[in-house]
Design a protein with these regions (language model features):
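Dynamic "connector" segments at or just before major functional cores
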Residues: 1-209
Length: 209
């Protein structure tokens, strides 16, 4: 590589070292474990009706981690999947809360060839579709802001978020809370999206912090 003031050198790592470029995410995994995020989700969100496939906790936590990692779309979940070090950490977290028998079964599952550490983009798209109510779309009026009524799964997610806030309040009680709200433009390439006042296609979710 071209040299400047400092003599930089680099070389490719030839062996499988298990390093990660997402070193900040394990801190959030630890926080989620301490606050019982998985328990909050499991108590209220019931999209998954069988024991097969990814659980509600795994799907939602993967989406949370994708957001924290700066993903722009569901397809960016591939970034997490390709990071071997992160996948090893996530696998460790998955087995921590289980019994020995469950842990051994999970470890055998993780050792299977081509096993994913996070749901595939198609699996996440199918999961997210459960939170969408097509009947509500019929009441949408062109050119007007519209907030669809939440279906049972969105209501469950709201309850899980309520419990999560309660866990934080329990550990750090506050008498007052300031809610900062703002409508933010999120650029999208979806063909059904409308153009924003900035001149590009976007959705405008109403965020509250």
């Amino acid at each position: 590589m071209a040299q400047g003031v400092l003599p930089y050198k680099y070389e490719g790592e030839r062996n499988d070292a298990g390093m990660t470029a997402l070193a900040g995410l394990p801190i959030y995994l630890d926080l989620a474990s301490v606050l019982g995020v998985a328990d909050c989700i499991g108590a209220h969100v019931h999209v998954r009706k069988s024991d097969q496939g990814w659980t509600d906790e795994q799907a939602i936590l993967s989406l949370m981690l994708l957001n924290l990692a700066g993903g722009d779309c569901v397809d960016d979940i591939k970034i997490l999947e390709k990071d071997e070090g992160f996948c090893r950490v996530l696998g460790r977290v998955e087995t921590k809360r289980q019994t020995r028998q469950q842990r051994r079964a999970m470890e055998r599952w993780w050792r299977k060839e081509h096993h994913r550490c996070v749901p595939s983009p198609s699996a996440l798209f199918r999961y997210l579709k459960a939170f969408h109510d097509p009947e509500e779309e019929r009441t949408r009026e062109p050119g007007r802001a519209f907030i669809p009524a939440p279906n049972e799964h969105l209501q469950g997610l709201r309850k899980a978020n309520r419990d999560f806030v309660g866990c934080i309040q329990k550990r750090h009680p506050e008498q007052e809370a300031t809610l900062d709200n703002d409508a933010t433009l999120v650029e999208t390439q979806k063909k059904e999206a409308l153009f924003s006042y900035e001149g590009y296609k976007a959705y405008q979710p109403f965020n509250i912090w």
